Amino acid sequence: MKRKLFKSMWLAMLLVAFAGYGTEKNAVVPQMNLPKTEAAAKAVPFYEQEYANVVDSVYKFIANGNSDNLPEQGRTGICEVRDFAKREAALQQLGYTLQDISGDGVPELLIGWISQKRGVGHYGKEIYAIYTFADGRVKYVAEGWSRSSLQLMANDNLVTRGGTGISHQVLAVEHLQPDGNLGCYELYFTWPKDDGLGVYRNMSCRSEADAAQETDMTVEEFNEMRSEYANHSVEIEFLPLKDFKKQGFKGLMRQYLSAGR
C-alpha cells in the first residue's frame, strides 16, 4: 500500500512537471524572423554582444583548437565533441540559440547537439552549456555531457540525468531564477545500502544519503521515472555553429524569446 501511495505521488509530480507540454511528443521551441530594419540592426542588446563572444570562442575552439577565450565552466561536453567528432561534423552538429528560460525577458545562451534536420531547421534535445546574463555580465548556469544529460522541459525546468556508476544515478529537476541562480525543485538518486541500492529524495539537490529521505521506490521505478523525463523533454531549434561567422544570431527573436512559444 505504501509503495502504491508513493508511486501515485511521483506520477502526480510528473504530471505537474509536464504541465504545459501539450499534445505533441516533441514540442519545438520556434524561431521567428523579425523585420530587418536599419534601426534594429544598430540596437543590438549588450547581452547579445557578450553572448556572441562566448559563441565565437566555442567556434574557434572547434575550428582550430584555440581555447584561449573558451569559458572555464561549461566546456566539458564541448570538449567531448571536439575529441570525438571531425572538425566539419562538429561545426555542423554543435548548435547555439537564445531562449528566455528564466522568464525575466532576457534570453539565455544555450549550446547543444543537433541530432536532426527538418526542412531548414536544425533540432536537438541535448544541451551542453547554458549561460545567462545577470549583473551586467555573462554567468554560467549548467552543463551536460555524455554521462550527464541536460535537457529542457516544456515548462522551462531543467532536468539532469547522470551518475558515476550503477550505484549512484541521479535525476535532478531545477529551474533558472531571474538572479541567474538555479533553484532546486527536487533530486532523486540511488545510493548503496545494506541490502542493495536505495532510492533517495531531497529538495536541496544534495546527493548524499544523510541529507535525504529514503523513498519506497524501487530502482526499476526510479529508472522508469528517468525515462519519462527524457521522453517528455522538448526539442530546441539551434543554429549550426558552422554558420556563426556569417549569420550570428540572425533569425532568432530578440529579448522576448519565450513569447512566441
Each language-model region and where it sits:
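Acidic/hydrophobic-patterned starts of short beta strands in beta-sheet-rich repeat architectures
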Residues: 102-114, 156-161
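Structural motif
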Residues: 119-129, 167-173
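Blade-edge motifs of beta-propeller repeat domains
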Residues: 32-90, 135-149
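Short consensus segments that form the blades of beta-propeller domains
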Residues: 85-89, 116-123, 162-165
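Bacterial N-terminal signal peptides that target proteins for export
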Residues: 2-10
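Acidic, small-residue rich beta-repeat scaffolds with periodic aromatic anchors
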Residues: 22-65, 161-261
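Surface-exposed loop/turn elements that mediate protein-protein interactions on large endomembrane-trafficking
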Residues: 127-142, 173-186
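Beta-propeller blade termini
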Residues: 92-101, 147-158
